[in-house]
Regions:
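Catalytic adenosine-cofactor/nucleotide-binding cores of aminoacyl-tRNA synthetases and other
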Residues: 1-52, 149-171, 176
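Conserved, charged catalytic cores of large soluble enzymes
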Residues: 4-8, 30-68, 88, 92-109
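Basic, alpha-helical terminal appendages of large translation-related enzymes
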Residues: 7, 12, 70, 75-76, ...
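Amphipathic, non-membrane alpha-helical segments in soluble helical-bundle scaffolds
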Residues: 15-30, 47, 51-58, 74-82, ...
């Protein structure tokens, strides 16, 4: 849905995009990862062990944030929204590629599992914040699921910095983010 150049903004189409793409991608990602974290780490966000030499998800998130801000600032809301969806898709790929549900079976892998889960939860926090200007209610629901909140006294762009999800913070009981 683009603006300008006779962009076609239709409420039903927008709702369909939100329900199909975001619910299936972001909702499932949040539910899967927070469930793993609650089960394996006593209902808390795990410590980020930082044992991986390169955090590909962090790098991808930084690029997505830069692209989102550029597109949003230039009124290209469709491209900004695509950056959010792209980050969610790549976060899902990261989770599937790293398979923490298999790694957790070996105790020696616990630090790596903590890092993987932290990275996915942190990426999801950023996804939630990126949605704030577009879908504030959905953004709030996502970050509430992470025990994280948008703080109005801190500039929005400063809250998009990687690593601000607080380790060992409690994860609330899950609720659907999209009805």
């Amino acid at each position: 849905i683009s603006l300008g150049n006779d962009g076609d903004f239709q409420d039903k189409r927008f709702v369909d995009i939100i329900n199909n793409d975001l619910a299936n991608t972001i909702g499932n990602l949040l539910n899967r990862t927070s469930s793993m974290s609650r089960k394996w780490f006593d209902n808390k966000v795990p410590n980020n062990e930082k044992i991986l030499s390169e955090n590909k998800l962090e790098n991808f998130a930084k690029i997505a944030v830069e692209n989102y801000i550029y597109n949003f600032d230039n009124y290209k809301l469709d491209l900004a929204a695509n950056e959010v969806l792209s980050l969610a898709i790549n976060t899902n790929l990261y989770l599937n590629d790293n398979q923490p549900w298999l790694l957790i079976k070996e105790k020696d892998n616990l630090p790596l599992v903590k890092e993987i889960i932290y990275n996915v939860l942190e990426s999801t926090r950023i996804i939630g914040l990126l949605l704030l200007p577009l879908l504030p209610e959905l953004s709030t629901k996502i970050n509430e699921q992470l025990g994280s909140i948008y703080r109005e006294e801190i500039p929005w762009k400063k809250q998009l910095i990687w690593g601000l999800l607080v380790s060992n913070s409690s994860l609330p009981k899950p609720t659907p983010i999209i009805n």
